[in-house]
Amino acid sequence: MGIVEEAHNLRVVGEGKRGVIVLAHGFGTDQSVWKHLVPHLVADYRVVLFDTMGAGPTNPDYFDFSRYATLEGYALDLLAILQELRVASCIYVGHSVSAVIGAIASISRPDLFSKLVLLSASPRYLNDVDYYGGFEQEDLDELFEAMGSNYKAWCSGFAPLCVGGDMESVAVQEFSRTLFNIRPDIALSVAQTIFQSDVRSLLPLVTVPCHIVQSTKDLAVPVVVSEYLHKHLGGDSIVEVMPSEGHLPQLSSPDIVIPVLLRHIQHDIAV
């Protein structure tokens, strides 16, 4: 097993002949977040699953704080994974920050991506002049302070807010588990990198077709953000806002989300 495979807990499942699908999870989760989607893909596709560096199941000794201080570090990891597996072209499904990571990777290697399915994606979380990302700087400062002072307590409060449900729901409990599995100092560093990121200037450079999918109600991504992506991406794009709630709809509302994702995976944008 190569260092890339080991570091990212790389798994390839399915023997399908319709091509390769790469599933990339967002902050606070790991590859298990795709458990409701994978069974629908394995008959038709080869499915690549991995954990982003810093996620709970990864070795914290491999987490390089300077490399992952920007999203480009994660994009380089993604390209290394595709190289390791000798993937010539893939359909990439990225959730949350991994949607943006896939978009960044596609700028330097558009040939590797036939399409990007961007679930709950945002190019910037902070509000700005003529831009509504959903957060003010003081909101983020409070979030970082809470993470730093008592990480376990923060997880318990953040999970239901993010997922959109009470602590008793299976999805909230699952997200709480994967969130709490991350080493606290790594979690804080990753959260700071994500929430302070701004990739708006890169969007016109993304020429691969993009399928933008999000919940009607999402604590982290207002619906107007999807319209912003649609307007500023450099290639063809389409937006679908689902009647779901929360930032992890593939976990909390699989009955709504899985059919939508499958449709965007299987059908291209009609030009």
From Swiss-Prot:
**Can you say where in the cell this protein is located?**
Nucleus; Cytoplasm
- Name the tissues where it is expressed: Expressed constitutively in all organs (e.g. roots, stems, leaves, panicles and embryos).
The UniProt disruption phenotype note reads: Loss of responsiveness to and symbiosis with the arbuscular mycorrhizal fungi (AMF) Rhizophagus irregularis and Gigaspora rosea characterized by the absence of physical contact and of characteristic transcriptional responses to fungal signals.
**GO MF term list:** hydrolase activity
One GO cellular component this record assigns the protein to is:
nucleus
The biological process GO terms on file are:
arbuscular mycorrhizal association; response to karrikin
Q: Which domain of life is it from?
A: Eukaryota
Active site, UniProt feature? 96, 218, 247
What keywords are annotated for this sequence in UniProt? Answer: Cytoplasm, Hydrolase, Nucleus
User: What family is reported?
Assistant: Belongs to the AB hydrolase superfamily.
Task: Say what the protein does.
Answer: May be involved in strigolactone signaling pathway. Essential for plant responses to karrikins, a class of butenolide compounds, structurally similar to strigolactones, released from burning vegetation that stimulate seed germination and enhance seedling photomorphogenesis. Mediates a specific perception of karrikin. Required for the establishment of symbiosis with the arbuscular mycorrhizal fungi (AMF) Rhizophagus irregularis and Gigaspora rosea. Karrikin binding induces a conformational change.
Record protein name field: Probable esterase D14L
Q: Per the UniProt entry, what species is this protein from, by scientific name?
A: Oryza sativa subsp. japonica (Rice)
Upper lineage: Eukaryota, Viridiplantae, Streptophyta, Embryophyta, Tracheophyta
